[in-house]
Amino acid sequence: MTRVVIIGGGPGGYEAALVGAQLDADVTIIDRTGLGGSAVLTDCVPSKTLIATAELMTSIQESRELGVRFGHVADIEAVATVDLAKINARVKRLASSQSSDIAGRLDAESVRFIMGSARLDGAETVVVTSDDGEERLDADAILVATGAHPRILDTAPPDGERILTWTQVYDLEELPERLIVIGSGVTGAEFASAYNALGCDVVLVSSRDRVLPGEDADAAEVLEHVLKRRGMTVLGRSRAADVRRTEDGVVVTLSDGSTVEGSHCLVAVGSVPNTEGLGLESANVVTDDAGYISVDRVSRTSARGVYAAGDCTGVLMLASVAAMQGRIAMWHALGDAVKPLDLKTVSSNVFTAPEIATVGWSQQAVDAGEIDARSLTLPLAGNARAKMQGVQDGFVKLFCRPGPGTVVGGVVVGPRASELIHAVSLAIEGGLT
């Protein structure tokens, strides 16, 4: 029986474990904090649970246009408020429940789970340290799926009370009076949008000239317009030089010397791979300058028999991609039929209000001449159903080959964009016009 050892219990790890078990391998999975990884315990599941409440609040706030009244109260915002302590209790409860569900699935497939830390000792041995002591596990195949953690700025050390990373916000008992969000990437934009909808005064500090610098420019423009309309302060081309805690809040000093005061500060400036202390050098596993493990399209590292999946590889850091990388690794390691990872049909979503979803070739690639394609944009403002639902902001943009009109990419901005984008993904995969 093939022995498989997996380091990391996130989507890349537990999905690989399920595939390995189904292919009759002897599978052991190790994680320090519990099954589900950051996706379940501190990132995707918690943030999307928080965002679910934010979406409901947005619907309530915009319901007046559709003729909804709450008694005789004219100011709906004064009636509809949130209990952040209850929201965060629900967040933690759902994360724990999902982790338990994953544990149950793995147990049913006879996968051994060890709560502890692990490191490689060569390309065929994993050393595990747990409450039961140290154990050496020999392996025919090893998968490293250790994820990543929030990048910490020396000028903004988190204290878990006023200066926070996105893993610490779920300990808050009360809604911040004024939240300063540093970083306008996906994580920063999502939290800024969510807390704005929950009723918090939000200041979004972006070092670039627009929010979501890595996303479609037209989509980012729509989002920034909506956020400002809803009362958010967006400071573009403003780099945070220092964050200092005061007696009852925080002061953020910008690079131009100006300051912004708030009650709390959320730092969302990217991630760092969890690859230190794993013994990768003992197996000659190559990492890049940022510490991410280099892999090919079937998740192989530079070391024979050692695979990697998920955020620790830096390959399109999405839970769905991590899961597919893990499955591909097991199919390849265990000799099953395998199709290399193809990111051109993988959609990525930003769960702001409105949502932003993209797939395939981008506007930037088209403009740079990387692919010969033309774009077609359909604003939601002119769509009959959008009008019925009171939707004013957003669009559908498709990138198509000249002549046959084959769809090669797309962007959707609007309610449920994360679901609508799947039709575009299928069109790309099927070569539809």
Residue ranges and their predicted role:
Residues M1-G12, L175-G185:
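Beta1/beta-strand and adjacent pyrophosphate-binding region of the FAD-binding site
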